[in-house]
Amino acid sequence: MMVSFTARAKSNVMAYRLLAYSQGDDIIEISHAAENTIPDYVAVKDVDKGDLTQVNMYPLAAWQVIAGSDIKVGDNLTTGKDGTAVPTDDPSTVFGYAVEEAQEGQLVTLVISRSKEISIEVDDIKDAGDTGKRLLKINTPSGARNIIIENEDAKALINGETTNTNKKNLQDLLFSDGNVKAFLQATTTDENKTALQQLLVSNADVLGLLSGNPTSDNKINLRTMIGAGVPYSLPAATTTTLGGVKKGAAVTASTATDVATAVKDLNSLITVLKNAGIIS
């Protein structure tokens, strides 16, 4: 489908030159496209500055444009001086490619295409810095990490190749507390251990347990924490109730050689058993 509109020449326009549009006060204005830009149209006749002209837009796949320099078949093209077509290696400004050779000043036929496959070299990317270009050229994860991470100890950590020196340096980087460093280096003193307990545990009763010297209150609270309740006291044993008994006093072996003395020794044993609560 053809689209037609009226435009005003913003400057003198020459036939078969590449054009760009701009917005005027009340009308579209046209002029030669700037160098190294993508054009919008191509002129098919001369137009003087300030004159109105009818712009007819056809669904064309190719243009004929004045060559601004010698052009070879297949050259990628961009806008040259005064709206001419010139070869370019900058993929961001390519608008087509030549299908025939042309010398400077001759008409060249070109296919309008921005989808032509273009090989982009990393070094040609203008907005990329040296570090970015180095990163784009890397094809291994470890190589990329070596560019992104400057610290040698951090590199060793990420690559899984830490030495003892790397480990110590990383601990110095990551931790400011000397007690934590001592723990990580397996060189804790009693003072370090006490300080670490204070860092890790807020409960006073647990701290008392860890110190190896819990108070009576600590013990009671710890038993409550673990659901042990209060200490169990055995009831006194009776003839009908199982209970606790005390150890009886020592009793020497009887040396009686007559009945009276044997009875006396037996009664002494019975007294000891009663006192211990073993018998009633």
UniProtKB/Swiss-Prot annotation:
Domain of life (superkingdom): Viruses
User: What Gene3D superfamilies would the database entry show?
Assistant: 6.10.140.1630
Please report the name of this protein according to its UniProt entry.
Capsid fiber protein
Q: What does this protein do?
A: Protein that forms the 55 capsid fibers. These fibers are not always present and may have been lost in some lab strains. They may enhance the attachment of the virions onto the host cell wall.
Q: Which UniProt keywords apply?
A: Host-virus interaction, Late protein, Viral attachment to host cell, Virion, Virus entry into host cell
Quaternary structure annotation from Swiss-Prot or TrEMBL = Homotrimer. Forms a super helix coiled coil in the homotrimer.
Major location category of this protein: virion
